[in-house]
Each structure stands twice: as C-alpha cells, then as structure tokens.
Amino acid sequence: NTATPYTSTVVFLVRKGNPKSVKDWADLVKPDVKVITPNPKTSAGGRWNFLAAWGYAYNQDKDTAKADAFVGQVYKNGPVIDTGARGPTVTFAQRGLGDVLPTWENEAYLVLQEFGADKFDIVSPPSSIYAEPPVALVAANAERKGTTKAAQAYLDFLYTDRAQAIFAKHHYRPIKRE
C-alpha cells in the first residue's frame, strides 16, 4: 500500500451547469476561464493541483518547457492565488469568484454538502493525478515522546475496516492493506 491508507485525485468544481464547459485541463488555459487554486509554494493541495496540471501538459508531447508554460498560464488565469487549500474553496464557493476550482475529490463533495449541490457540479477530467498521502511512524520522535505504542496503534487502525469506512464516508478512496 506504499504507506498510504487512502487515495484521492484532483477534480474540477464548476458552477452549476458548467457554463464555461470545463471538461479537461486544457480548458483551464482558455482566456475567459478564471481558475481558483492555492499557491503550490505554500499549500500541499496546491502542489497536487500543480503536479496534475503539469502532468497533463507533459503527457501531451513530453516537452517540459511546454508543460511549464501551460502551468504558468493556468496560474495567470487565477484572479486570486490563496496560500492554503481551504482558502480557494472559500473564495470559489462563498465569495463566488472564478469559474473552476481544481481540488481534491473529497473537498469537492464537501462543497456540495456545505453549500448545496444545486450550485456546483463536479467534473472529473479524463486524466488527473493519483494522490497518495503517506503516513509513517517516525521511531526517533515516538521513542523520545514515549508514544510509540499509541502511534503504532493509530497506524494499524488506519487500515481497519472501520477506518476505511470513515475514509469512504468522507469521499476519500479507501485502500485495504494486503
């Protein structure tokens, strides 16, 4: 399981009816499409978005310069580049700025629950990133703090049926340890 108890991917949250017809990463560089995304220098979610966009562009013709330019244009289409992953969600869902919010799949579903499925649609692009957030016990830290047993129990719990059901309930993609 490569030390990850669940996975996710980056999807697009768009306004209801998808008025800008956003279907794939290439749509994010259209001049009339405003992209709301976090800064990849300050946000882990922003880094996943950056990597997903870059991977899409690179896979078009294996040209790193073109992939760099593509991602640069995605960010130029951003009227606001927030510092954290939650900021862009607030900017998009509450403040009503932008046409598309690239975000983790679970976050997109949370927006539907919090703000109403009648206001937004989720678009799954044909290609995206396979996000695997890792977990690990750092032995030196756990030993120094006397928390090794608790840390190991927590790690073991993450792969139980109960924890996997919790991940699924919150729109993450569970993964069972073999």
Where would I find each of the regions flagged by the language model?
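Solvent-exposed loop/turn segments at secondary-structure junctions
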Residues: 12, 17-20, 40-45, 106-109, ...
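Ligand-binding pocket segment of bilobal, Venus flytrap-like solute-binding proteins
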Residues: 60-126
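Extracellular/periplasmic juxtamembrane helices and adjacent flexible linkers that interface
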Residues: 142-178
